[in-house]
């Protein structure tokens, strides 16, 4: 698990802010609504009395950063940076796993494929108001997907599925997945019109 990265410039920025706070004050990094589409990463001051026994402490040169137990898995690979450009300076927080908990390498194929869909496929479909979810993985390794939102009934679903999603998932899960199908295509039987 690669922990959160707080860049040198961000550490200097927090160091200056903390110098104006009561002694012993550090920072807390957290995620509000973790594991949901509304997840947001935040930073706040953390006075000594606010430190919990279950917190994870990251010791830095100028201060310590505390992460609460609930936020911890969602802050994996997160980065806090302090960027200065022509427009001024700003703190940037990137937490790629805030909306979806990162799965471990030994997770089931279903969990790993679902994670890939939530973090790689759905952000691309969101621009069209669409989404896709994993319905099942068949015994012969075919991932059955359920399209929703703007994708449902869209004539481009087949192209999106074959050219985009299937290529991406088969490359990522080579040797584990044999194909990717739309749930309606998979469910087609003698009762289907075409």
UniProtKB/Swiss-Prot annotation:
Family annotation (HAMAP family): Fe_S_biogen_NfuA
NCBIfam families on file: PRK11190.1, YhgI_GntY
Keyword Iron-sulfur: yes
GO MF annotation terms: 4 iron, 4 sulfur cluster binding; iron ion binding
Alphabetized UniProt keyword annotations: 4Fe-4S, Iron, Iron-sulfur, Metal-binding
Subunit structure: Homodimer.
Cofactor requirement: [4Fe-4S] cluster
Job description of the protein: Involved in iron-sulfur cluster biogenesis. Binds a 4Fe-4S cluster, can transfer this cluster to apoproteins, and thereby intervenes in the maturation of Fe/S proteins. Could also act as a scaffold/chaperone for damaged Fe/S proteins.
Protein name, as recorded: Fe/S biogenesis protein NfuA
InterPro entries: Fe/S_biogenesis_protein_NfuA, FeS_biogenesis, FSCA_dom_sf, HesB-like_dom_sf, NIF_FeS_clus_asmbl_NifU_C
Family, as annotated: Belongs to the NfuA family.
Family matches, as Pfam families: Fe-S_biosyn (PF01521), NifU (PF01106)
Single biological process term from Gene Ontology: iron-sulfur cluster assembly
Cofactor annotation comment: Binds 1 [4Fe-4S] cluster per subunit. The cluster is presumably bound at the interface of two monomers.
Binding positions ([4Fe-4S] cluster): 151, 154
């Amino acid at each position: 698990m690669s922990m959160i990265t707080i860049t040198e410039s961000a550490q200097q920025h927090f160091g200056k802010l903390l110098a104006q706070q009561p002694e012993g004050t550090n920072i807390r990094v957290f995620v509000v609504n973790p594991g949901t589409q509304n997840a947001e990463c935040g930073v706040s001051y953390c006075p000594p009395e606010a430190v919990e026994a279950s917190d994870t402490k990251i010791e830095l040169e100028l201060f310590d950063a505390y992460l609460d137990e609930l936020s911890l898995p969602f802050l994996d690979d997160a980065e806090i940076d302090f960027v200065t450009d022509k427009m001024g300076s700003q703190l940037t927080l990137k937490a790629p796993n805030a909306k979806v908990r990162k799965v471990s390498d030994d997770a089931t194929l279903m969990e790993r494929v679902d994670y890939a869909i939530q973090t790689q496929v759905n952000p691309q479909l969101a621009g069209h108001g669409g989404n896709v979810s994993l319905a099942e993985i068949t015994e012969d390794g075919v991932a059955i997907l359920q399209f929703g939102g703007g994708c449902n009934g869209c004539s481009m679903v087949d192209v999106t599925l074959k050219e985009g999603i299937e290529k991406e998932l088969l490359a990522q899960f080579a040797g584990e997945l044999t194909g990717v199908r739309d749930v309606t295509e998979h469910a087609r039987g003698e009762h289907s019109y075409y």
